[in-house]
């Protein structure tokens, strides 16, 4: 293991320009910042959790970060390299609504079986509540829903065939037909 290259290889850069929503210049800047924070060129779960803790200092971000990490780590090797990082960032920050829905579904589908169960959804919603902290959550959560009540409300709107699981199709259809569902998923009730 030598020192990680401080520059992206031209073929990697070209590939990322083609497969993300970032320009060549933006990718170079992101890579520079990524190497500054991760000199090894990869992030493990603990390092990833530390980044989340910086962004959410008033709550416990560790559980949510664990789920985000799983979603970022496309090859399942227990680390996030720059490619995985920038591709996920591209989708979450600049992707189409459809791409964002696919990414969110992946995060909620904990076991990757193509369906979201009530327990899976509850785990993510509880992690969001913990991450943002009690005081902020009380401000955001003007409807006063507990995590379980929020899950029940989401399932009522999304689970079209009432089989207690949400497929990708149900997820997308409901989110497109009722944008307030997306707010429920984010636990952001500010209008």
From Swiss-Prot:
CDD domains: EFh (cd00051). Residues 24-59, 60-95, 96-131, 146-181 form the EF-hand domain. GO terms for biological process: central nervous system development; regulation of signal transduction; response to heat. A lipid is attached at residue 2 (N-myristoyl glycine). Ca(2+) 3 binds at residues 159, 161, 163, 165, 170. Ca(2+) 2 binds at residues 109, 111, 113, 115, 120. Ca(2+) 1 binds at residues 73, 75, 77, 79, 84. SMART domains: EFh (SM00054). Pfam families: EF-hand_1, EF-hand_7. The keyword Metal-binding applies. Keywords: Calcium, Lipoprotein, Metal-binding, Myristate, Repeat. GO terms for molecular function: calcium channel regulator activity; calcium ion binding; protein domain specific binding. InterPro entries: EF-hand-dom_pair, EF_Hand_1_Ca_BS, EF_hand_dom, Recoverin. May be involved in the calcium-dependent regulation of rhodopsin phosphorylation. Belongs to the recoverin family. PANTHER family: CALCIUM BINDING PROTEINS, HIPPOCALCIN-LIKE PROTEIN 4. Probably binds two or three calcium ions. This is Hippocalcin-like protein 4. It comes from Homo sapiens. The gene is HPCAL4.
């Amino acid at each position: 293991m030598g020192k990680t290259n401080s520059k992206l290889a031209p073929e990697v850069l070209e590939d990322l320009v083609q497969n993300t929503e970032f320009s060549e210049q933006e990718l170079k800047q992101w890579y520079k910042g990524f190497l500054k924070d991760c000199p090894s060129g990869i992030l493990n779960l603990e390092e990833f959790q530390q980044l989340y803790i910086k962004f959410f200092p008033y709550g416990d971000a560790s559980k949510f970060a664990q789920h985000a990490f799983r979603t970022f780590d496309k090859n399942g090797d227990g680390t996030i390299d720059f490619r995985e990082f920038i591709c996920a960032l591209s989708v979450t920050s600049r992707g189409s609504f459809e791409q964002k829905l696919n990414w969110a579904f992946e995060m909620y589908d904990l076991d990757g079986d193509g369906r979201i169960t009530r327990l899976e959804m509850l785990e993510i919603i509880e992690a969001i509540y913990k991450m943002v902290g009690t005081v902020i959550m009380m401000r955001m959560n003007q409807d006063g829903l507990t995590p379980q009540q929020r899950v029940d409300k989401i399932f009522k709107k999304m689970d079209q065939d009432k089989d207690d699981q949400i497929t990708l199709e149900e997820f997308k259809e409901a989110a497109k037909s009722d944008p307030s569902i997306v707010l429920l998923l984010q636990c952001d009730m500010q209008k």
